[in-house]
């Protein structure tokens, strides 16, 4: 059992910081709404968006993967652009790989705050 936990830890290059940051999202022209970030680091984030990631939408899991996503964090005055890399439709969660931000210094500060 110890081997499985070590393998999961090795997948991430950087340690994630547990947070609960409320944000607005936009995916393409059709989907927008609210969600919250569960954990973050400089390269990615785990987001919870049950309204976006749900099975009743008629969208298959493979359709989410690779989609561009814009995450706006009004409290921090920063927007994060990323790509969806994994989705869990049962939990309404997804993983986003960050491609760019509107303020890299501010994003780094958010990731480092305790």
Region spans (language model):
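N-terminal helix initiation/capping motif
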Residues: 1-53, 111-114
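C-terminal output/interaction extensions
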Residues: 8, 13, 91-114
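Short boundary/loop segments of OB/S1/cold-shock single-stranded nucleic-acid-binding domains
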Residues: 8-11, 58-60, 69-70
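Short conserved beta-strand and strand-loop elements enriched in small hydrophobics
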Residues: 19-27, 61-77
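Short beta-strand-centered aromatic/proline hotspots
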Residues: 34-37, 80-85
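A residue-level detector for short acidic-glycine micro-motifs
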Residues: 39, 86-88, 100
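Residue-level recognition of conserved beta-strand positions in structured domain cores
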Residues: 49, 73, 82-84, 97-100
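Short, conserved charged micro-motifs
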Residues: 54-59, 105-106
């Amino acid at each position: 059992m110890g081997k499985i936990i070590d393998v999961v830890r090795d997948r991430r290059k950087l340690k994630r910081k547990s947070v609960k940051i409320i944000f607005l999202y936009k995916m393409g022209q059709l989907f927008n709404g609210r969600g919250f970030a569960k954990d973050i680091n400089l390269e990615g984030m785990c987001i919870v968006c049950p309204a976006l990631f749900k099975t009743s939408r008629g969208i298959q899991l493979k359709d989410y993967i690779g989609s561009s996503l814009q995450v706006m964090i009004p409290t921090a005055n920063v927007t994060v652009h990323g790509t969806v890399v994994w989705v869990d439709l049962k939990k309404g969660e997804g993983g986003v790989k960050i491609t760019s931000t509107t303020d890299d210094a501010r994003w780094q500060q958010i990731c480092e705050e305790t």
